[in-house]
């Protein structure tokens, strides 16, 4: 029997891993330069956490969650998104005692049972952060600004930030009624999912890809905002305009999670076709209370690593790739091996990537392997070199080689490599 990876998952290795490291390290740097702390939560939680937070009638809960019973009979779900676990951790660990305006970022795998396609897998990976405490539109601005900073730091330019306000529970009531009246006139023409959502969560009709043409003429949420929500949205746009962060107002944007209030946004990249979203987020002021805590304003964002990497490739952005096989030490004989290990240790202390042969191959086999792995230099040590107190440094690209006094080998090699 041949074992294969599960459908909707991927193995990541070789040059591809450098794209992942580039995205993750850039994200960490942006977050930590803004004073955002890292948080790590379990990849599985109680199912009810996501039912309460994401929404019982959402597509995620209805169709996409990986849910199972553990041996104690508890319903467990692999996390489909990262916000609810952070809120749960915040409440459970009494992090509110640290005061308001707390900020946490995360990087990790999420799980949804969807049809696998380019950039959309069943195990996918996200970067994200949550800002807990501020109600001011300054916080909404900061989130969008940091997302824009992160994407530009990666080198991306061909994306647009879509922005909307879906109001608070008070003003959204009138908006729901307006949508009911509008869609009620065309209900027979809608897809089965939209007919179900008409009764359970009518805002989700705006996000339907099948009946998208109806959303173009649907009532706009911004026309039903209360004075407080309208002022919040206006101020957010003023901040974005002042700092020249470009955005597109998109009044069909609602996002796929039920916990959002007021600000919602989505980043779409022009190089990814129909599945163009690479990041999104918004405000979720009612989620803490919904999960059993006090009412705490909060907001955040998440970006799909797979999608962001596709965007990098679509723009042809070159990323830094470190050669982890920079120096290869080829040895002949037991004594030469022991000295090779010592030299490798000296070079690694100087920050070089060094590999030592442990296969007892002939010299030709060792050098062939070094070239195959992409090593730039080979250090050759045999009985003759030991007797002379030297090592040979060979440039595997040019074939040039030089004899080096063993006592100064580490310094010489480190200096030689630094000049390339």
UniProtKB/Swiss-Prot annotation:
Keywords: Aminoacyl-tRNA synthetase, ATP-binding, Cytoplasm, Ligase, Nucleotide-binding, Protein biosynthesis. It comes from the Bacteria. SUPFAM superfamilies: Class II aaRS ABD-related, Class II aaRS and biotin synthetases. It is found in: Cytoplasm. It is an enzyme of class 6 (ligase). One of its GO terms (cellular component) is cytoplasm. GO terms for molecular function: ATP binding; histidine-tRNA ligase activity. Coiled coil: none annotated. Gene3D superfamilies: Anticodon-binding domain, Bira Bifunctional Protein, Domain 2. Pfam families: HGTP_anticodon, tRNA-synt_His. The keyword Transport does not apply. Its EC number is 6.1.1.21. It catalyses: tRNA(His) + L-histidine + ATP = L-histidyl-tRNA(His) + AMP + diphosphate + H(+). One of its GO terms (biological process) is histidyl-tRNA aminoacylation. InterPro entries: aa-tRNA-synth_II (IPR006195), aa-tRNA-synth_II/BPL/LPL (IPR045864), Anticodon-bd (IPR004154), Anticodon-bd_dom_sf (IPR036621), His-tRNA-ligase (IPR015807), HisRS-like_core (IPR041715), HisRS/HisZ (IPR004516), HisRS_anticodon (IPR033656). Belongs to the class-II aminoacyl-tRNA synthetase family. Homodimer. This is Histidine--tRNA ligase.
């Amino acid at each position: 029997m041949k074992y294969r990876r599960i459908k909707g998952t991927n193995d990541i290795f070789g040059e591809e891993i450098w794209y992942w490291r580039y995205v993750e390290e850039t994200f960490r740097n942006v977050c930590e330069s803004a004073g955002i702390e890292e948080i790590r939560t379990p990849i599985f939680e109680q199912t009810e956490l996501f039912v309460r937070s994401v929404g019982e009638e959402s597509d995620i809960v209805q169709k996409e969650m990986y849910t199972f019973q553990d041996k104690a009979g508890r319903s467990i779900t692999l996390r489909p998104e990262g916000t609810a676990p952070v809120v749960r951790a915040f409440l459970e660990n009494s992090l509110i005692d640290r005061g308001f305006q707390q900020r946490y970022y995360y990087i990790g795998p999420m799980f949804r049972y969807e049809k696998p396609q380019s950039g959309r897998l069943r195990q996918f990976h996200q970067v994200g952060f949550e800002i807990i405490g501020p109600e001011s539109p300054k916080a909404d601005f900061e989130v969008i600004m940091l997302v824009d900073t992160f994407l530009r730091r990666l080198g991306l330019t061909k994306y647009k930030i879509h922005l909307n306000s879906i109001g608070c529970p008070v003003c959204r009531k009138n908006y729901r009624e307006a949508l009911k009246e509008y869609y009620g006139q065309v209900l027979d023409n809608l897809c089965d999912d939209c007919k179900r959502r008409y009764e359970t969560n009518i805002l989700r009709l705006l996000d339907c890809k099948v009946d998208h043409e109806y959303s173009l003429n649907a009532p706009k949420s911004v026309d039903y905002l209360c004075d407080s929500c309208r002022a919040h949205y206006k101020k957010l746009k003023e901040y974005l305009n002042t700092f020249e962060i470009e955005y597109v107002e998109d009044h069909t944007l609602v996002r796929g999670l039920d916990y959002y209030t007021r600000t919602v946004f989505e980043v779409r990249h022009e190089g990814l076709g129909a599945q163009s979203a690479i990041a999104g987020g918004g405000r979720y002021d009612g989620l803490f209370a919904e999960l059993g805590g006090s009412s705490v304003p909060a907001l955040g964002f998440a970006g799909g690593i797979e999608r962001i990497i596709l965007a990098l490739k679509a723009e042809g952005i070159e990323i830094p790739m470190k050669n982890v096989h920079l120096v290869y030490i080829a040895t002949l004989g037991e004594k030469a091996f022991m000295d090779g290990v010592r030299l490798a240790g000296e070079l690694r202390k100087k920050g070089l990537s060094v590999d030592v042969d442990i296969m007892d191959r002939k010299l030709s086999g060792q050098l062939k392997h070094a070239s195959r792995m992409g090593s730039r230099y080979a250090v050759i040590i045999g009985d003759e070199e030991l007797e002379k107190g030297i090592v040979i440094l060979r440039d595997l690209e040019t074939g040039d080689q030089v004899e080096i006094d063993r006592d100064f080998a580490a310094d010489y090699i480190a200096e030689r490599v630094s000049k390339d």
